Amino acid sequence: MNTRALVRLCLVSTIIIALDQATKALVATTLVLHESIPVIHGFFNLTHIMNPGGAFGLFAGHSPEVRKFFFLFVSSLVALMILWLYQRTAQTHRVLSFGLAAIFAGAVGNLIDRFRFGMVVDFLDFYLGAYHWPAFNVADSAITIGMVVFVYHVIFNKVPDL
């Protein structure tokens, strides 16, 4: 990996991780657990939630030890796989490298929470009427955006041979 690609990874990751951790800290110090502040009435709240599971509450019903092991292991594995893929594509596929850096940063952002709290701070709460999309955070958003970029490259055969 050349220096420019490494700088791109570090810069994008640092910005996303810092924004993720800063927003989570702000929510945790401003709102008590489960408190909501309406931002757009009938559509969007800031709600302090501690998510013991994964996306959509995956594994939330398992013991804290099982969850912690599973998510720490999987998050670490994903981060390493993304770094491996980034190293192989960053010089030739610039847009893909931004997407991979976003996935990496999101995984690390949530991994920090799992190390610190054994669960993840979520707070972005979108809803329509009684239907609530599961709350999420900046790290989750980065992972989602990065995955959209990655899937685009896969679908349109823009991922290089590895």
From Swiss-Prot:
- The top EC class, named as a word, is hydrolase
Alphabetical keyword list: Aspartyl protease, Cell inner membrane, Cell membrane, Hydrolase, Membrane, Protease, Transmembrane, Transmembrane helix
**Entry annotation: catalytic residues:** D122, D140
Q: In Gene Ontology terms, what is one molecular function of this protein?
A: aspartic-type endopeptidase activity
Which pathway does the database say it acts in? Protein modification; lipoprotein biosynthesis (signal peptide cleavage)
Principal location: membrane
Q: Which InterPro entries match?
A: Peptidase_A8
State its location(s).
Answer: Cell inner membrane
Residue spans crossing the bilayer: 9-29, 39-59, 66-86, 95-115, 136-156
Gene Ontology BP term (one):
proteolysis
What is one term from the GO cellular component aspect held by the record?
Answer: plasma membrane
PANTHER family with a match to the protein in the record: LIPOPROTEIN SIGNAL PEPTIDASE
Recorded hits in NCBIfam families, A to Z, give:
lspA
Q: What does this protein do?
A: This protein specifically catalyzes the removal of signal peptides from prolipoproteins.
The family classification in the record reads: Belongs to the peptidase A8 family.
What name does this protein carry?
Answer: Lipoprotein signal peptidase
Q: State the organism named in the record.
A: Desulforapulum autotrophicum (strain ATCC 43914 / DSM 3382 / VKM B-1955 / HRM2) (Desulfobacterium autotrophicum)
Gene for this chain: lspA
